[in-house]
UniProtKB/Swiss-Prot annotation:
Keywords: DNA-directed RNA polymerase, Nucleotidyltransferase, Transcription, Transferase
Protein name: DNA-directed RNA polymerase subunit beta
Subunit structure: The RNAP catalytic core consists of 2 alpha, 1 beta, 1 beta' and 1 omega subunit. When a sigma factor is associated with the core the holoenzyme is formed, which can initiate transcription.
Similarity comment text for this entry: Belongs to the RNA polymerase beta chain family.
EC number: 2.7.7.6
GO biological process entries: DNA-templated transcription
InterPro entries: DNA-dir_RNA_pol_bsu_ext_1_sf, DNA-dir_RNA_pol_bsu_external_1, DNA-dir_RNA_pol_su2, DNA-dir_RNAP_su2_dom, DNA-dir_RNAP_su2_hyb_sf, RNA_pol_bsu_bac, RNA_pol_bsu_CS, RNA_pol_bsu_protrusion
Length: 1368
């Protein structure tokens, strides 16, 4: 088995019972693949597939002028490389994007030859089409300097859907069936039955009309309509009665209204008897062709065709007329013998279309189309052209209507056609097929669709959403171009004169900046980033709304299995509408979610893996991943638990066709990180999944001792860690950069064989948490491609580490852990276990005001030198300064308006030239309740404005860092080149050279070492080929130097050019403060099983319960939090964590007594290979075993994968191994070694019962009491009511509401109440009075009229009611 460089350092012991058949796919693949398909940036213009940008262009171009003599054609598009890289965009507040240029061709035809087109002239040109934001390698976008994510949308797939109203519309509870044709874009077409069984249609949810109007509009006559939906009964009229052509099936189940006889007159069915199968057999045996029927059998039937008098050509009766006595009389008079009527019955052949034709008042195609026009455009006169144009535009025009590839495939599948391709507009037979199926449904044949089935909902990813916006922009451009194309020839215009890119840019900008699906990235920790990018939302444009979404849409559907996680979804109004992709889920070409299965043939599981969509899956019998199989892959059990079309059942192995690939297949990333998930209640698992995303990265991340094995995948795929692009040797490492000399076989010829990784140091995330990368390699380490070189936030040796492993005791402790409160030892705080760093960004801008420019300066009047002590000469705070609330960070003054001066002030000013009062101090200060250390300052200056010293210094530092990188690359390049050169030169014969090298001398190593490297190139070689090689190496080094100088100049130019700032802004300063947050009472914490709580008290270490060996617990939790919540997983985690730590202590003890390496190897083999997945420790060298052991001292990390975790028996084995009997006895353990005797820290007495004790991975969540604590003495007041504002952000007061007033009234505390409602709130005069009284030392309250009462009086007056106060 292959272990990567980092995996070898610390192997996670897995308890999985099943081998890995299918690796977890790259977790951000959906986002990255979708966007690369959209751009197709690396594909040459001519070879691009018709999708993404290419599809948008080809759908709008060519644009033809109104007169048809000029057209604009699209040739290809190209994307330029972005001006700034991702980091620069984030610092400068820019969008990371690329300019899109399209090559278009203007073709002008000759007007002189209207018959056949003759090209007069062709102009081709590249036109700028706006900026397209680019995706970062981690699947996000940088928009205006902040990282955003475009969430995928789950929407109803285009196609045709049949449903009924579940009997809710009509009071009788009758099922009303309906059908809806949904295109990708264009008008929706609905068909619906009303309670009277008449079929209507409506377009775009407008007024409904009988469906036969639509059928006539597409060109069918009433006869054709009836022929399409009914079978006919044929009658031959006799002088009395008639002969009916006998069709046995149509008579079954009916009641005979007369005696039915055979040819000889023998009665087979008596009158009023129901016709059954025996009667039909008798009639068939008698070879009956016709049945004689009496006259009244014909009455009430409906004619299927127009009946025309052969002689006169007069229509005697029309199709769909009822047969009456008078009609029969007319028919006999005209000598008509044969007539056809519609065959209907009450059971499975209703007269719906016939009834609808009766309601329909239109007569022909034109009338029908006019009726549709009137419905769509009420009040407009229906001219012939307008009517035709509107009808064709509705469903037949490619510009206005697009069913899309998916829609056509779904439509054809639903109506039972074999081919899945076809035209993208609606065809006449599509409409007919839909109505036929709907009528059949009403007749009781077939099934309605389930709209929550994942075969009927598809995912729209970033690429598709962006393409739709881009197309919308292009369509706006198209309108403008059409107008101008007519003048193209006369005014001699070029393509760039025709195309204005503004509409495209604004459409794209609006989408990425403010669409509901473009969200501010959740960056609290790596897991929250990954989850955000894998999120699937049913909300957003074209989706559902929270208020309208019912219960069914939100519920878990059987087709979610392996596609969408049934656990992870937000609590609250969005529950079930926002979901997360399952671990292995994948999108197919149509946008439907697929999940992988292993193929099973003749009850033998093969290695073939097929991805099935929800529709395909319904056709197969699928076994679960935990079905027992032998070593040959044969299914062993007599009955296997399996699923078919959403139903679970036990079947024999020979019926199984597929099998799940992994037990974790059904859950998302966050849920698969919960160990023992199978023992937790679903609601708590949901909370656990959601709370892991809120874990704040700790100062020193610590891997979970009990994990699930997915931690490494998660950390690596999130992009938080630094991975090696190419293998090689670590050449240099410090805290900020890693330099790797690439292996020869991986380096491309002629390029620098150096990879430099600049680490991210103390950077602010979107949620103000700290992103910091730490190298985990040493100089000289050999690394391969994909190895982890540096840990990021919340990762430890390349594994996700969201919290800390805490020693947890489940016991009550003086009521301090009542109701989920958490008791924590002071040692945890002292060791900085949960200390986190939060980075706050504070901005100040200097604007150009009407009264003059604002100035950033140190020269501020009325400020003491103490307050200015931390500012440099430019007025900006030093890096490293420790600041408190209220301290000045950036000094800034704003010009004040000229005030009217008193004569005395004028005199003083004239004498002293006092000018300082013209400006007011508007410096940037640290907000209330914040303190920290300044870690970075950025200064941005507008083009053409003099840079201050500080800004210049920042630029110089940046250039110095860049030069260092280039020098490193050059050093390695030259080092390699000179090594190659030395190998080549030694032993060669020289024709002369420096240091008097004689002709014909053989060059040796000593001579070269004595010579300066650059003088080697002056050696003249006898061998021409070698001389040429020497020259080539010299040229390549000089070329590299030239390239590096160019790169440096490029960087300098970027840094020294002015910054793009908003209008009116001259200078902007950003100050970054690092705030250290220690754990304190009021902080929210949680485990991974939904067991959340608030820290109630931090207890001195000596008061905590402790074990017999003196080791105190870190955390005390209430045992009552477990049984009612049913998340027993936390208890199992504690047991297994206890074993993991115990094993670590045993390894530590071996290292301390310097045990033999064989003993160590044997012990590790026992741990890793006694049960669960086997590890290949044989391949480790002794040094590697030793390093592994050192890393295991803090606990052997375990992996217990979801639904395939450690059993009770395995946990028992591990506990026995970790705590041999002598240690167990000393600690007072119970026989199963999962409970321990504890002693009270305050009294030293032993607790009555043993306590469950062990290690749990515990997280600190992003709800910190520091962000919530807030107090106000005086502050801002609301303008109208004059009451204090509310909330921390406004520095508001505490609301004393209605109920609180009742409480004081109940106590009769009238003076307290008066004070609360007047001087402490909105009695303006009273407030000032109180202040005056306090200054005088007189503690008296003069309460007046509350301002809000005056507001009330004014409001009453505004209603026209005169209200006055009588003062007495």
């Amino acid at each position: 088995m292959q272990y990567s460089f980092t995996e070898k350092k610390r192997i996670r012991k897995s308890f999985a019972k099943r081998p890995i058949v299918h690796q977890v796919p790259f977790l951000l693949a959906t986002q990255l693949e979708s966007f690369s398909t959209f751009l197709q940036a690396d594909v040459p213009g001519t070879q691009r597939k018709p999708e993404g940008l290419q599809a948008a262009f080809t759908s709008v171009f060519p644009i033809v002028s109104h007169n048809g003599f000029a057209r604009l054609e699209f040739v290809s598009y190209a994307l330029s490389s972005p001006a700034f890289n991702i980091k620069e965009c984030q610092q400068r507040g820019l969008t990371y994007c690329s300019a899109l240029r399209a090559k278009v061709r203007l073709v002008i035809l000759d007007k002189e030859s209207p018959n056949k087109p003759v090209v007069k002239e062709v102009k081709e040109q590249e036109v700028y089409m706006g900026e397209i934001p680019l995706m970062t390698p981690t699947g996000s976008f940088v928009i205006n300097g902040t990282e955003r994510v475009i969430v995928s949308q789950l929407h109803r797939s285009p196609g045709v859907f049949f449903e009924h109203d579940k009997g809710k519309t009509h009071s009788s509870g009758k099922l009303l069936f309906s059908a809806r044709i949904i295109p990708y874009r264009g008008s929706w077409l609905d068909f619906e039955f009303d309670p009277k069984d008449i079929l209507y249609f409506r377009v775009d949810r407008r007024r409904k009309m009988p469906v036969t109007i639509l059928l006539k509009a597409i060109g069918l006559t009433p006869e054709q309509i009836l022929a399409n939906f009914f079978v006919f009964d044929n009658f031959t009229l006799m002088d009395e009665g008639a002969q009916l052509e006998f069709v046995p099936e149509r008579l079954r189940g009916e009641v005979a209204r007369f005696d039915i006889t055979d040819r000889d007159g023998k009665v087979i069915v008596q009158k009023d008897k129901r016709i059954n199968a025996k009667h039909i057999r008798d009639l068939e045996a008698a070879k009956t062709k016709f049945i004689s029927v009496p006259e009244d059998y014909l009455l009430g039937r409906v004619l299927a065709k127009n009946v025309v008098d052969g002689d006169t050509g007069e229509v005697i009766a029309s199709a769909n007329d009822e047969v009456t006595e008078s009609v029969l009389e007319k028919l006999r008079e005209a000598g008509i013998k044969e007539i056809q009527t519609l065959y209907t019955n009450d059971l499975d052949q209703g007269p719906y279309i016939s009834s609808t034709l009766r309601v329909d008042e239109t007569t022909d195609k034109t009338a029908a189309r006019i009726a549709i026009y009137r419905m769509m455009r009420p009040g407009e006169p229906p001219t012939e052209e307008a009517v035709e144009a509107l009808f064709n535009r509705l469903f037949y025009s490619e510009e206005a209507y697009d069913l899309s590839k998916v829609g056509r495939m779904k439509f054809n599948r639903r109506v039972g056609r074999d081919e899945i391709t076809g035209p993208m507009t609606l065809q006449d037979d599509d409409i007919l097929a839909t109505i036929k199926i709907l009528v059949e449904l009403r007749n009781g044949k077939g099934e309605v669709d389930d709209i929550d089935h994942l075969g009927n909902r598809r995912v729209r990813c970033v690429g598709e959403l962006a393409e739709n916006q881009f197309r919308a922009g292009l369509v706006r451009v198209e309108r403008a171009v059409k107008e101008r194309l007519g003048q193209a020839e006369s005014e001699n215009l070029m393509p760039h004169d025709l195309i204005n890119s503004k509409p495209i840019s604004s459409a794209i900008r609006e989408f990425f900046g403010s669409s509901q699906l473009s969200q501010f990235m959740d960056q609290t920790n790596p897991l929250s980033e990954i989850t955000h990018k894998r999120r699937v939302s049913a909300l957003g444009p074209g989706g559902l709304t929270r208020e309208r979404a019912g219960f069914e849409v939100r519920d878990v559907h059987p087709t979610h299995y392996g596609r969408v996680c049934p656990i992870e979804t937000p609590e609250g109004p969005n529950i079930g509408l926002i979901n997360s992709l399952a671990l292995y889920a994948h999108l197919n070409e149509y946008g439907f979610l697929e999940t992988p299965y292993r193929k099973v043939v003749d009850s033998k599981v093969t290695d073939q893996i097929d991805y099935l969509s929800a529709i395909e899956e319904g056709r197969y019998m699928i076994a679960q991943a935990n079905a027992a199989i032998d070593e040959n892959g044969q299914l062993v059990d007599e009955l296997v638990s399996s699923r078919e079309a959403g139903e679970t059942m036990m079947v024999t192995p020979d019926r199984i066709q597929y099998m799940d690939v992994a037990p974790s297949q059904i859950v998302s990333v966050a849920a698969s990180l919960i160990p023992f998930l199978e023992h937790d209640d679903a609601n708590r698992a949901l909370m656990g999944s959601n709370m892991q995303r809120q874990a704040v990265p700790c100062l020193r991340p610590e891997k979970p001792v009990v994990g699930t094995g997915i931690e490494r995948t998660c950390a690596v795929d999130s992009g938080t860690t630094v991975q090696a692009f190419r293998g090689g040797v670590v050449d240099y490492v410090d805290a900020g950069r890693i330099v790797i000399r690439v292996n020869d076989d991986e380096a491309v010829a002629g390029e620098v064989g150096v990879d430099i990784y600049n680490l991210i140091k103390y950077t602010r995330s979107n949620q103000n948490t700290n992103i910091n990368q730490r190298p985990i390699v040493k100089m000289g380490d050999k690394v391969s491609r994909g190895d982890v070189l540096a840990d990021g936030a919340s990762t430890d040796l390349g594994e996700l580490a969201l919290g800390q492993n805490m020693l947890i005791a489940f016991m009550p402790w003086n009521g301090y852990n009542f109701e989920d409160s958490i008791l924590i030892s002071e040692k945890v705080v002292a060791d900085d276990r949960y200390t986190s760093i939060h980075i706050e960004e504070l901005n100040v801008v200097a604007r150009d005001t009407k009264l003059g420019p604002e100035e950033i300066t140190r020269d501020i009047s009325n400020l003491a030198e103490v307050q200015l002590g931390r500012l440099d000469e430019s007025g900006i705070v030093y890096i490293g300064a420790e600041v408190e609330a209220g301290d000045v960070l950036v000094g800034k003054v704003t010009p004040k308006g000229e005030t009217q001066l008193t004569p005395e002030e004028k005199l003083l000013r004239a004498i002293f030239g006092e000018k300082a009062s013209d400006v007011k101090d508007t410096s940037l200060r640290v907000p209330s309740g914040m303190s920290g250390t300044v870690i970075d300052v950025q200064v941005f200056t507008r083009e053409g404005i003099q840079r201050d010293k500080r800004a210049q210094q920042i630029i110089d530092d940046e250039l110095k860092r860049y030069r260092l990188d280039l020098n490193d690359q050059l050093r390695i390049v030259e080092g390699d080149a000179f090594q190659r050169l030395a190998r080549m030169l030694v032993g060669k014969v020289a024709n002369g050279g420096p240091k008097k090298l004689a002709k014909g001398t053989k060059i040796d190593q000593a001579y070269l070492e004595d010579l300066d490297h650059y003088h080697w190139f002056d050696i003249r070689l006898a061998d021409d080929e070698a001389a040429a090689q020497l020259e080539a190496i010299k040229n390549s080094i000089e070329e590299k130097r030239h390239q590096f100088d160019l790169a440096f100049e490029e960087k300098r130019k970027k840094l020294t050019q002015g910054d793009e700032l908003p209008p009116g802004v001259l200078k902007m300063v950003k100050v970054y403060l690092a705030v250290k947050r220690r754990l304190q009472p009021g902080d929210k914490m949680a485990g991974r099983h939904g067991n959340k709580g608030v820290v109630s008290k931090i207890v001195p270490i000596e008061d905590m319960p402790y074990m017999a060996d003196g080791r105190p617990a870190d955390v005390v939790l209430n045992p009552l939090g477990v049984p009612s919540r049913m998340n027993v997983g936390q208890v199992l985690e504690v047991h297994l964590g206890w074993a993991a730590k115990g094993l670590g202590w045993r390894i530590g003890e071996m290292l301390q007594r310097q045990a033999k390496i064989e003993e160590m190897r044997a012990f590790l083999t026992k741990i890793y290979n006694d049960s669960g997945r086997k590890e290949d420790l044989e391949s480790f060298t002794d040094d590697e075993i030793l390093e592994l052991a050192k890393n295991l001292r803090e606990g052997v990390p375990f992996a217990t994968p979801v639904f395939d975790g450690a059993t009770e028996e395995e946990m028992g084995k591990m506990l026995d191994l970790a705590f041999p009997d002598d240690i167990a006895e000393q600690l007072g353990m119970n026989p199963s070694k999962n409970q321990v005797r504890l002693y009270d820290g305050r009294t030293g007495e032993m607790f009555e019962r043993r306590v469950t004790l062990g290690y749990m991975h515990y997280l600190k969540l992003h709800h910190l009491v520091d962000d919530k604590m807030h107090a106000r003495s005086t502050g801002p007041y609301s303008l109208v009511t004059q009451q204090p504002l509310g909330g921390k952000a406004q520095f508001g007061g505490q609301r004393f509401g209605e109920m609180e007033v009742w409480a004081l009234e109940a106590y009769g505390a009238s003076y307290v109440l008066q004070e609360m409602l007047t001087v402490k709130s909105d009695d303006v005069n009273g407030r000032t009075k109180v202040y005056e009284n306090l200054v005088k030392g007189d503690h008296v309250i003069d309460a007046g009229m509350p301002e809000s009462f005056n507001v009330l009086v004014k409001e009453i007056r505004s209603l026209g009611i005169d209200i006055d106060l009588d003062r007495n």
